[in-house]
Regions:
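Hydrophobic/aromatic-rich alpha-helical bundle segments in the mid-to-C-terminal region
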Residues: 98, 120-132, 144-193
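Helix-turn-helix
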Residues: 11, 15, 19-58
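Solvent-exposed, amphipathic alpha-helical segments
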Residues: 15, 19-22, 69, 73, ...
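N-terminal intrinsically disordered/low-complexity leader segments
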Residues: 1-7, 146-149, 196
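Amphipathic alpha-helical segments used for helix-helix packing
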Residues: 83-84, 99-125
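Short, structured helix-loop boundary elements
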Residues: 9-10, 30, 52, 56, ...
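Hydrophobic alpha-helical connector segments
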Residues: 57, 71-104, 148-151, 157-158
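Short, basic, alpha-helical segments at the C-terminal edge of helix-turn-helix-like DNA-binding modules
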Residues: 61-66
């Protein structure tokens, strides 16, 4: 009979998430993960296979708890024209809050800016899947907000909105004011569509 884990997997993932979020994937050492999780290296590797395996578990949880809880509403069949406006307003409020998580920026886009992404196709694939999912959600929001315009015009507006949101999330860590300006531009545009 195999040994059962003497730790709570959810607690370990949350603790590791905080370290990866604050330090980034490339800059996080296993010793830091040991300290944050209370586990030894061997337990981390046994439970997750590797540092990358733990990061993948963190990303899955981050997507479910942080990202999809926000963008999922944009993709609901009954999403109204105001859904995208509300999403952008929430993003602005989160960045303006000044909380440690807001100041840390986006976990996945921070990873995208690290040199490891160039060398690690698995991490690159995680980041690409995230930005694709974000783009699809924003496209659904634009579709709800502007059903009267052509599909090509909605696609172009979606890409502009998504690019500004991704830019804002990418710079939130180092320049929250620039992030707010990018999101503010999107919010103003989207609010004008909804009120038109």
């Amino acid at each position: 009979m195999g040994r059962t884990s003497a730790f709570d997997r959810d607690d370990v993932i949350r603790a590791a998430r905080d370290v990866f979020w604050a330090r980034g994937y490339a800059e996080t050492g296993v010793a830091e993960l040991e300290e944050a999780t209370g586990l030894k290296r061997s337990s981390i590797y046994h439970a997750f296979g590797s540092k990358k395996g733990l990061f993948e578990a963190v990303v899955a949880r981050y997507l479910d708890e942080v990202v999809r809880s926000r963008i999922g509403r944009l993709q609901q069949p009954d999403a109204g024209p105001e859904a995208l406006e509300l999403y952008i307003a929430e993003m602005r409020a989160a960045i303006a809050s000044g909380t440690p998580r807001a100041q840390a920026g986006c976990l996945l886009l921070n990873a995208a800016c690290a040199p490891v992404v160039d060398d690690d196709p698995d991490v690159r694939a995680l980041v690409t899947a995230y930005t694709d999912e974000l783009r699809a959600a924003i496209a659904a929001g634009v579709d709800s907000a502007r059903p009267e315009i052509s599909a090509a015009s909605r696609a172009a507006l979606s890409e502009v909105c998504a690019s500004l949101v991704i830019a804002a999330l990418a710079v939130a860590r180092v320049d929250p004011d620039a992030a707010d300006r990018s999101l503010g531009a999107v919010h103003t545009a989207v609010a004008s569509w909804v009120s038109a």
